[in-house]
């Protein structure tokens, strides 16, 4: 891949037989029992480049991935560049249903740009628009603001971008900076992932209350509204009819969005009911997990193994 000086692969699980490395630029590091955020920090500390690109082990990068992002760092104020993680074309239909739900604006609102290419030009981005499966970071900025916070996963990239933007650096979204991301199949594996996203967002909200987004509030309100329907039916019919009307409107909007998402995602219309159901369950799962996590008295770090603060030096990896 042109423009790539080195490739550092970090495995946070023990590997008995390391893979065969066919490129001299590739290094494989094994650091068992590190959290995902700690493993990312180890990758940063073990690399040498000024611009560090991140992707995941379930992604395939586009051939123009690097060239679409690196030139933007000629602006010294640009600290982060990223783009969408598009559903991999070889995914199974059940995985593509999950992808269609994520790509739908009615499904993930402004965060849909993480899962589908939005717009035609480069633009300023917020923490909700980018993901670590497709992100480029400037090393000197990380040395100023710190690395990934090990106590947060997922949403560790959201927390980092929040700190970066608070320092006045630019964060850019590039629609043609693409990786192809394998989705988890519906229903249980996908909803488990959504639940973890909500827990990470709740942890981020506890740390930065201003990071609470209206879209998160909407998912929480949906859960509370459904819980309130039986009670209001028995006590206050006027409120019940108002809530029921809102629910009907919500169902109509998500139904239409699921059909459109199937068409734009090149998914057969016969999967539309599944996509619609996935959007509904995704909202309920996200809102419920967020409320439960936020209501707990304390949120313990998800990282395991040795303490690895995001601002300190990492432990030495085992190199096979």
What are these regions (language model features)?
Residues 1-34:
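Acidic donor-binding segment of Leloir-type glycosyltransferases
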Residues 31-47, 68, 133:
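Glycine-rich, basic loop-to-helix element that forms the pyrophosphate-binding segment
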Residues 48-49, 131-145:
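Conserved nucleotide-sugar donor-binding
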Residues 52:
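Short aromatic/hydrophobic "clamp" motif used to bind/position activated sugar donors
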Residues 63-104:
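Conserved donor NDP-sugar-binding/catalytic core segment of glycosyltransferases
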Residues 83-84, 89, 101-128, 132, ...:
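Short, flexible, basic/aromatic active-site loop/helix in glycosyltransferases
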Residues 149-212:
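Catalytic donor/gating beta->alpha subdomain of glycosyltransferases that bind UDP-sugars
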Residues 222-299:
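Membrane-embedded multi-pass helical conduit in multi-pass membrane proteins
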């Amino acid at each position: 891949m042109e423009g790539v000086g080195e490739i550092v692969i970090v495995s946070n699980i023990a590997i008995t037989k390391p893979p065969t490395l066919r490129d001299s630029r590739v290094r494989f590091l094994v650091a068992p029992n590190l959290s995902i955020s700690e493993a990312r920090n180890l990758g940063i500390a073990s690399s040498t480049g000024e611009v560090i690109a991140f992707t995941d082990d379930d992604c395939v990068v586009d051939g123009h991935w690097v060239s679409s992002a690196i030139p933007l760092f000629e602006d010294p104020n640009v600290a982060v560049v990223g783009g969408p993680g598009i559903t991999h074309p070889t995914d199974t239909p059940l995985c593509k249903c999950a992808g269609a739900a994520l790509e739908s604006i009615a499904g993930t609102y402004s965060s849909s740009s993480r899962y589908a290419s939005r717009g035609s030009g480069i633009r300023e981005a917020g923490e909700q628009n980018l993901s670590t499966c497709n992100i480029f970071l400037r090393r000197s900025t990380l040395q100023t603001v710190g690395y990934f916070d090990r106590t947060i996963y997922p949403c560790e990239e959201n927390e980092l971008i929040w700190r970066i933007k608070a320092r006045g650096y630019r964060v850019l979204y590039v629609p043609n900076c693409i990786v192809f991301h394998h989705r988890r199949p519906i229903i249980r594996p996908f909803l488990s992932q959504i639940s973890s996203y909500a827990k990470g967002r709740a942890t981020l909200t506890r740390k930065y209350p201003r990071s609470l987004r209206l879209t998160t509030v909407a998912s929480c309100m949906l859960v509370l509204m459904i819980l309130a329907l039986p009670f209001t039916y028995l006590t206050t019919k006027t409120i019940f009819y108002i809530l029921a009307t809102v629910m009907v409107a919500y169902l109509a909007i998500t139904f239409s969005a699921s059909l459109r998402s199937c068409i734009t995602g090149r998914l057969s219309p016969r999967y539309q009911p599944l996509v619609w159901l996935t959007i509904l369950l995704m909202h309920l799962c996200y809102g419920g997990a967020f409320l439960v996590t936020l209501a707990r008295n304390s949120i313990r770090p998800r990282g395991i193994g040795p303490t690895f603060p995001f601002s300190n030096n990492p432990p030495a990896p085992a190199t096979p």
